[in-house]
Amino acid sequence: MKVRAFLAVDLDEGLRDHVSRIQDTLKSADAQVKFVEPENLHFTLKFFGDVGEGKLRRIENVVRDTLRGYEPFEISIRGAGVFPNPRYIRVVWLGVENPETFSDLQRSLDMEFVKMGFRPERDYVPHLTVGRVKGPRNRDKLAELIGELQNVEVGSMRVSEVSLKRSELTPAGPIYTDMEVFRL
């Protein structure tokens, strides 16, 4: 049986309230945005899609081997932004200040995943997705609010583990379940 899987760093629980307040500010635009539930907030390192049991075991081994070269590290979450651009907003995110270690970790993992047949990530930017735009209503107001939040400081957290997660899509939204948690 295949599962929809991805590799991620969970947002520190102590920062969820602050992110929820930022989401509340963005909700005031009354735009067509599906906001990420606080318990689902994470930094994606790699989305695998549907993978079978054998490939999951290989992914786990690659992650375990790669993480041996890393110690826990701190990141600061700061600034709101969008993908792909402010004129056509699809994703609203919060960024990572000084993301070098985070980006290096992602690159190291991705190089190994490419050897397994996964597509390489292009132009990876460490970010915390806070919402996905579903329609055009009040997009200008949303863009204005995001602009006002471009320097917002969320806080710092220690990255000490990476989670291999299952994503189950439901009408109420995705349900994420940890399949394996790896310590740095």
Swiss-Prot record:
MF terms in GO: 2',3'-cyclic-nucleotide 3'-phosphodiesterase activity; RNA 2',3'-cyclic 3'-phosphodiesterase activity
Keywords attached to this entry: Hydrolase
Active-site residue numbers: 42 (proton donor), 127 (proton acceptor)
Motif HXTX 2: chain residues: 127-130
Highest rank taxon of the organism: Archaea
Pfam families found in the cross-reference section: 2_5_RNA_ligase2
Protein EC: 3.1.4.58
Isomerase keyword on record: no
Motif HXTX 1 per record, residues: 42-45
SUPFAM superfamilies named in the record: LigT-like
Catalysed reaction, written as an equation: a 3'-end 2',3'-cyclophospho-ribonucleotide-RNA + H2O = a 3'-end 2'-phospho-ribonucleotide-RNA + H(+)
Biological role stated in the UniProt entry: Hydrolyzes RNA 2',3'-cyclic phosphodiester to an RNA 2'-phosphomonoester.
Membership in a protein family: Belongs to the 2H phosphoesterase superfamily. ThpR family.
Name of the featured protein: RNA 2',3'-cyclic phosphodiesterase
Origin species: Methanothermobacter thermautotrophicus (strain ATCC 29096 / DSM 1053 / JCM 10044 / NBRC 100330 / Delta H)
